[in-house]
Amino acid sequence: MANMLYFSLLALLFMTGIASEGTISSGLASLKAKIDAKRPSGKQLFDKVANMQKQIEEKFSNDDERAKVMGAIGSLSTAVGKFQSGDPAKIASGCLDILVGISSVLKDFAKFSPIFSILSMVVGLFSGTKAEESVGSVVKKVVQEQSDQELQEALYGVKREYAVSKAFLDGVRNETSDLSPTEVSALGANVPVYQGVRFIAMVVQRIKNRKPRTESEIKRVLSMLELFTDLCSLRDLILLDLYQLVATPGHSPNIASGIKEVSNLGREEYKKVFEDLLKTNDKETYLFLSYLYPRERNEQSQKIFKFFDLMKVKYDDRLKQDLTGIQVFSSLHWPNYFLCSSKDYLALICTKPYGSLRLDKLNDGFYSIKTTQSNPKVCHRYGEYILFTHDRNDDLEKFNFVPVKLGERKIYLLSSKASPNKFAYVPKTAKGDLFFVDGIPSQLGYGNQGYFTLATDENEQT
């Protein structure tokens, strides 16, 4: 069977943990519950899932393999509802979910063929007509926002490339198709998405050439990044489907090999563009990072980071780090001054516990900052400075520790969910108050006053 090198574009995100046959059955039950069996395509998919359940329970005895199976099933379970929603953004997200899950079972294509069969069925729910409508909706909105005539013109070609390619796959996947394997291979070599990269390349070029410095510019770049993610996810899933079709005995191995190479075109160049955007040692990217990070902040950020990981984009490990725990918070400008549990400002002398605060990561990736007392106070923004209080202030008490580097030193900028464009800084005097300013402090003449350090207080961990 043809080598699976085509999938080298995907990170091998191996699922951890042990899944029993009962757990697999439970996962499949969850998948079946999300399938609309009243629709013809849904009924066919439902029956195939039921059959796959029997095969999996008989075939896999190794714990690691069962865990991989669960990874693929989990991706299908989340994707089916998105495919059936009719929402173009959710459909694109469903494609990405499948790409993430399938990366865990790529080592042995033959052994996991039942799962690939179901994948083909799920992809098949995305019919040719819906493909044209959905892809058109996904890209049209963002392209219109860019007011870019060249991109708008290229859009029409992209819609046709995707729709015709899906129509071809839906046709040959049909069990009544009388095409021979060699005919399928010949046709597969000429489906439009096989060659179509112009629009995606244009989107990347726009991102590369735009240095976002204002909130509106940053939001446009984020929209372009999301557009790129949607387009590549859709295209890669179509190519995956096409590869499955022609990488089986009887088809042309040369065509299968060609499909692998097409997927890799431009990948390294694209990765370099994204890695430049995520640099933590470049002051030009700091404001952008405050809008993209944390990765859990919204569906847009989640999708972009998930795709970056699939593309193996390199970035600062701290963008994945969880800072939850007891931390000592200080300023690079006044390294001996700490944000104390008993005060609302950086102080030279803190009462016990010495400069220790509790950080808790919230569902949206932002952090709450609390004192470590039995009846803790919560840190929040009050106007342009910070206070500790027992009152709740919603988004004003959600903070973002944006990881940056000064030389080789790993430090943080402090912003909030409510105002990602405003950053904390300390005055040059030793008073220690924390103020917020609109923009990156170091670019506004504040030097090191807007850089902060965090250190785990091992003695205060609970």
Curated annotation (Swiss-Prot):
GO terms for cellular component: extracellular region; membrane; nematocyst; other organism cell membrane. Contains disulfide bonds. N-glycosylated. Keywords: Allergen, Cytolysis, Disulfide bond, Glycoprotein, Hemolysis, Ion transport, Membrane, Nematocyst, Secreted, Signal, Target cell membrane, Target membrane, Toxin, Transmembrane, Transport. One of its GO terms (biological process) is killing of cells of another organism. GO terms for molecular function: toxin activity. Heat-stable protein that continues to cause erythematous skin eruption in the patient and to recognize IgE after heating. Glycans are attached at residue 174. The keyword Iron-sulfur does not apply. It is found in: Secreted; Nematocyst; Target cell membrane. Residues 1-19 form the signal peptide. Belongs to the jellyfish toxin family. Type I subfamily. Critical allergen and main toxic protein of C.quadrigatus venom. Has potent hemolytic activity. Is lethal to crayfish. Causes cutaneous inflammation in humans. May act as a pore-forming toxin, disrupting normal transmembrane ion concentration gradients in susceptible cells. This is Toxin CqTX-A. It comes from Chiropsoides quadrigatus.
